């Protein structure tokens, strides 16, 4: 992260943000009843 970056003081949070969003997307996909694989393109 750059020292002037928006999330510079939140390095731990920022590094896990993408992982948490992927987990949330997987949960939404699962509970919406859609079958099949999760794709990036929708």
UniProtKB/Swiss-Prot annotation:
Induction: Expressed in both exponential and stationary phase; expression is considerably higher during stationary phase and 2 proteins of slightly different sizes are seen (at protein level). This is Protein YkgS. The sequence of this protein is also found in a much larger protein (yfjI, AC P52124) found in another position within the CP4-57 prophage region on the E.coli chromosome. InterPro entries: DUF3987. It comes from Escherichia coli (strain K12).
